């Protein structure tokens, strides 16, 4: 899906790692939430409250998911899932455009 209809967008940005990771929150009528953002090259560690699906729209990164010993390469057009209540690491190689979906009650 390349666009969203009938949504509420929170104007204030979510800013992490001194501005190297930024996003905007999108709220849907059914109560679901997504963020659209940009990852600058660098290494990042994030925790999750809910299950997350990270769709990389453009760019290139490595991700290490919970329980994995090796890094997986992710490029534009690919996605990965992160379990709720866990941590994951990203090593962003090229500026990456992403959409993160938060999956409730997982």
Curated annotation (Swiss-Prot):
Keywords: Glycosyltransferase, Transferase. Catalyzes the phosphorolysis of diverse nucleosides, yielding D-ribose 1-phosphate and the respective free bases. Can use uridine, adenosine, guanosine, cytidine, thymidine, inosine and xanthosine as substrates. Also catalyzes the reverse reactions. InterPro entries: Ppnp, RmlC-like_jellyroll, RmlC_Cupin_sf. It comes from Leptospira interrogans serogroup Icterohaemorrhagiae serovar Lai (strain 56601). GO terms for molecular function: guanosine phosphorylase activity; purine-nucleoside phosphorylase activity; pyrimidine-nucleoside phosphorylase activity; thymidine phosphorylase activity; uridine phosphorylase activity. The gene is ppnP. Its EC number is 2.4.2.1, 2.4.2.2. This is Pyrimidine/purine nucleoside phosphorylase. Gene3D superfamilies: Jelly Rolls. SUPFAM superfamilies: RmlC-like cupins (SSF51182). HAMAP family: Nucleos_phosphorylase_PpnP (MF_01537).
